[in-house]
Amino acid sequence: MDFSERVTTLVPEGAYFMLAKAQALEAAGKNIIHLEIGQPDAPTFANIAQAGERAIREGHTRYTPSAGMKNLRLAIAQDAGKRRGLTFTAEQVVIGPGAKPFLFFPTLALVRPGDEVIYPDPGFPTYKAMIEVAGGVPLPVPLREDEDFSFDMQVFDRLVSPRTRLVILNSPSNPTGGVMPQTVLERIATSAIQHNFWVLSDEIYARLVYETPAPSIATLPGMAERTIICDGFSKTYAMTGWRLGYGIMPPALAERVELLLTHSIGCTASFTQIAGLEAVQGPQENVEAVVAEYRRRRDILVEGLNRLPGVDCRKPQGAFYVFPNITGLGHTSDFIAEYILEQAGVALLPGTSFGQNGEGYLRLCFANSLENIQDALERMQSALKKLR
């Protein structure tokens, strides 16, 4: 069939591709430990699930405004502002079914054909896809392992030009777990003001940090008016299947993004939004407990990976991923990922699922039980001993 250029460059996400392979092996009788998909292993917290169930029983199953229910927008504005030391209004908040619309729609609203967009590589695959759909020119900036997988600022400075329209940040990062330091954010902010570009800050993992909070570029002088914050409920509140996210941006841009929602998605399910309201306004002890458990799993996984021959793993500061360097194994990331799946029954992702600069790395998700993580380490150790 003859398709438009907007879709001919799109490719599947590597995580779903690997999941399909792993499930095929499971269907054939092989036991698989799944460390490839980035979603919490715990169910949605009980108070949130109960709020959603109650909303359905009470008849909250009708359309809502495209930008979301006003009480939820206000609650998010207050909560997100308090956590960042900023003041947001409800008019700056737009609600959608998941966080991805707030990667995609601001890009569609801002990027013109031929505009250049700088994004992290390795990084979330949707970044490059949405830039291309918008007609922009994607320019990858490498992440430096020796600087906690922060931007290579020498490359970044070379990429910035009068054609730069948007820079995408992700901190804490998928796939690396790296947190961008304040000094790097300050350099990017200075460049944004000097060259007059926007920043799209993907902060979906902002609550999942293990040592110190992840700073937001929106807090720096002159940046609130040129920053879009993308966040959501999936990772923090174990609500991946509920599909609830939001963007925070200047009101004029929020109006345009709302129009894109109106003419595409329509609105977000009302009962999902009511569950989200409980998530924001209800007790946060479950989040704190989950973060503490993730920290414990992270430490055990990193220690175990560093005992494997040819593997070197930095301790991530946020998110729930590790991104070990496997160049010492002498094979490509794709080969090692396939080998571990077939020989060890452990599903994980090659670094190249996140861009060309992911070569030499693997991504493993530790949002899984400690028992499975320890079993996976034992299986990997056994399999790698046989590697030629």
Predicted feature descriptions by range:
Residues 3, 11-13, 18-21, 25-32, ...:
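PLP-dependent class I/II
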Residues 7:
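Substrate/cofactor-recognition hotspot
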Residues 71:
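Active-site proximal helix/loop that lines the substrate pocket
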